[in-house]
Amino acid sequence: MLDAFSRVVEQADKKGAYLSNDEINALQAIVADSNKRLDVVNRLTSNASSIVANAYRALVAERPQVFNPGGPCFHHRNQAACIRDLGFILRYVTYSVLAGDTSVMDDRCLNGLRETYQALGTPGDAVASGIKKMKEAALKIANDPNGITKGDCSQLMSELASYFDRAAAAVA
């Protein structure tokens, strides 16, 4: 996993150059933005259980055929695995928000996940729907202006949304 700082240093080192003013300014912007990132991660972490549980309940209501007798996720172990996987994905989304980078999510969570679901007979589009439900809840929680660092968070919210979109696309 390379964070933004490591990437900039690595790129400068490959060129055998000092950091440019543009690179330093970009890193200063990241530092200024870090409190907002920490606020978002803290909120998502504090609300992780409800985000996952509510997404799962909404998914069951939306796609009962997947969870009813005869469905691919009928058995309680499969249902527990669904909840667990949604939680894993949310956790890796928070890592991505903190790092400003998807490499850890890609490497440790998403790579091979679609194939795993296919092998288990789990409909990837159902998992993607659950991820989208988590995205909606996470954005609502993260966008609440009370008790967080002031300032424009639109770019960060767009970034947060993109991490959920990436996860949903990886399993669909």
Curated annotation (Swiss-Prot):
GO BP annotations, alphabetical order: photosynthesis
Pfam families noted in UniProt: Phycobilisome
SUPFAM superfamilies from the UniProt entry: Globin-like (SSF46458)
Sequence positions that bind (2R,3E)-phycocyanobilin: C82, C153
One GO cellular component term noted in the UniProt record for this chain: plasma membrane-derived thylakoid membrane
PTM note: Contains two covalently linked bilin chromophores.
Main location class: membrane
Compartmental location: Cellular thylakoid membrane
Keyword Electron transport attached: yes
InterPro entries: Globin-like_sf, Phycobilisome_asu/bsu, Phycobilisome_asu/bsu_sf
Highest taxon, organism lineage: Bacteria
Keyword list, A-Z: Antenna complex, Bile pigment, Chromophore, Electron transport, Membrane, Photosynthesis, Phycobilisome, Thylakoid, Transport
Keyword Transferase annotated: no
Membrane topology: Peripheral membrane protein
Purpose of the protein: Light-harvesting photosynthetic bile pigment-protein from the phycobiliprotein complex.
Family, similarity comment: Belongs to the phycobiliprotein family.
Subunit structure as annotated in this protein's UniProt entry: Heterodimer of an alpha and a beta chain.
Name under which the protein is recorded: Phycoerythrocyanin beta chain
Originating species: Mastigocladus laminosus
